């Protein structure tokens, strides 16, 4: 059969495999490229090529990640797989690989293990919105009741971390059998069922331009006779001339009107996600606005000082600290375009945090920052990055 033309017109969805070491994440990743490649074209990848993932540096943090892609009937999937547990932690916290949904791989022969739990918790903390489960190695379990028991355990574990355990699709199969071309229920057809579950359970992601307008302020200029211009890159949404917007963060929120949008010295009617623009603001003085604030549509983002965060602390080899830090540690938190000092409160029972650790902490900033859950930040000491984090929950 001739391979169909590789289509780029399908909607693009980002997914990735998570789960305990040796439960078959990489084998399943290979199976997805092989089985879907037969149906829709695209590159098939074998286990070895995925397992030898290249090292990448994201914000100074070394992460090994394999990127593969495959098609379904209706979608194009970009899929990430990490060789080691530490790579998952770093990947999810830095948002190097944003996931619209995750495939939790759990060995039916072993059931949920410590990293199964940890990856579900991480998914909750960093805002992975959907999880689909693949119970792998089903060929190694003869007892039907045992399979049902493992499925029940996984569903309960998902419930524990506020994922809808009862409604989550759970697919039984064997990634290895699928790669071998096995046509029984647990072979190739199980991969088809998994992809169907991804198609139906993970909604199409909202395009950046369809989200509310937000632009971090990078620089401010005064133009004689015209007013004040704030420049930056539009993060999400669309801004149009004549709209009322808010200036949020660091100081009390103020409202202003957009009187012009320009890009490369040309006047535009609007600026949209990804554009580097200057926004002319009516009645706003140069001293009313500063770097680190954001421009946003009214009521879409609020300033906060206190939040729960999931943090990865750089190891010494990554250029991080050489020593641990303790309760009350006060570094700078770099949000979008600026540093704000904050105090760290460690969880009960945690005496200290070592370089290379990941930790949940509560942070209180000295100035409010415009934030939503899921916002990424860097932790810095004197301009040097020593950690990366994500806002897991806003407290105040």
From Swiss-Prot:
Name of this protein: Elongation factor Tu
Family note: Belongs to the TRAFAC class translation factor GTPase superfamily. Classic translation factor GTPase family. EF-Tu/EF-1A subfamily.
Positions of the UniProt region annotated as G3: 81-84
Subunit structure: Monomer.
Species: Hydrogenovibrio crunogenus (strain DSM 25203 / XCL-2) (Thiomicrospira crunogena)
Start and end residues of each stretch annotated as G4: 136-139
Chain positions recorded as Mg(2+) binding sites: 26
Gene field: tuf1
Gene3D superfamilies: P-loop containing nucleotide triphosphate hydrolases (3.40.50.300), Translation factors (2.40.30.10)
């Amino acid at each position: 059969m001739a391979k169909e033309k590789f289509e780029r017109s399908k909607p693009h969805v980002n997914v990735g495999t998570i789960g305990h070491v040796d439960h078959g994440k990489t084998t399943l990743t290979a199976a997805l490229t092989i089985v879907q490649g037969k149906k829709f074209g695209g590159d098939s990848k074998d286990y070895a090529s995925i397992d030898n993932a290249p090292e990448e540096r994201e914000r100074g943090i070394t992460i090994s990640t394999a990127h593969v892609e495959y098609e379904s009937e209706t979608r194009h999937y970009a899929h990430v797989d990490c060789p080691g547990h530490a790579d998952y932690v770093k990947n999810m916290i830095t948002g190097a690989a944003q996931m619209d949904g995750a495939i939790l791989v759990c060995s039916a022969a072993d059931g949920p293990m410590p990293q199964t739990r940890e990856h579900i918790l991480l998914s909750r903390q960093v805002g992975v919105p959907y999880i689909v489960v693949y119970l792998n190695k089903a060929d190694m379990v003869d007892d039907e009741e045992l399979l049902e028991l493992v499925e029940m355990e996984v569903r309960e574990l998902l419930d524990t971390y506020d994922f809808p355990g009862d409604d989550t699709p759970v697919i039984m199969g064997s990634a290895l059998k699928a790669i071998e071309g096995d046509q029984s229920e647990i072979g190739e057809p199980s991969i088809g069922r998994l992809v169907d579950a991804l198609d139906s359970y993970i909604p199409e992601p909202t395009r950046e331009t369809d989200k509310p307008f937000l632009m971090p302020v990078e620089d401010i200029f005064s133009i004689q006779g015209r007013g004040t211009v704030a420049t930056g890159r539009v993060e999400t949404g669309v801004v149009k001339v004549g709209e009322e917007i808010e200036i949020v963060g660091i100081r009390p929120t103020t409202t202003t009107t957009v009187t012009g949008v320009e890009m490369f010295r040309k006047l535009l009617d609007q600026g949209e996600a990804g554009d580097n623009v200057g926004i002319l603001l009516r009645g706003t003085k140069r001293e009313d606005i500063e770097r680190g604030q954001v421009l946003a549509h009214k009521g879409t983002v609020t300033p906060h000082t206190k939040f729960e965060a999931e943090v990865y602390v750089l190891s010494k080899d990554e250029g991080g600290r050489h020593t641990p830090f303790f309760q009350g540690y006060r570094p700078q938190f770099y949000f979008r375009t600026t540093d704000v000092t904050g105090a760290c409160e460690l969880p009960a029972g945690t005496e200290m945090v070592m370089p290379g650790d990941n930790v949940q902490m509560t942070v209180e900033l000295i100035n409010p920052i415009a934030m939503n859950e899921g916002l990424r930040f860097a932790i810095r000491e004197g301009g040097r990055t020593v950690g990366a984090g994500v806002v897991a929950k806003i407290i105040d």
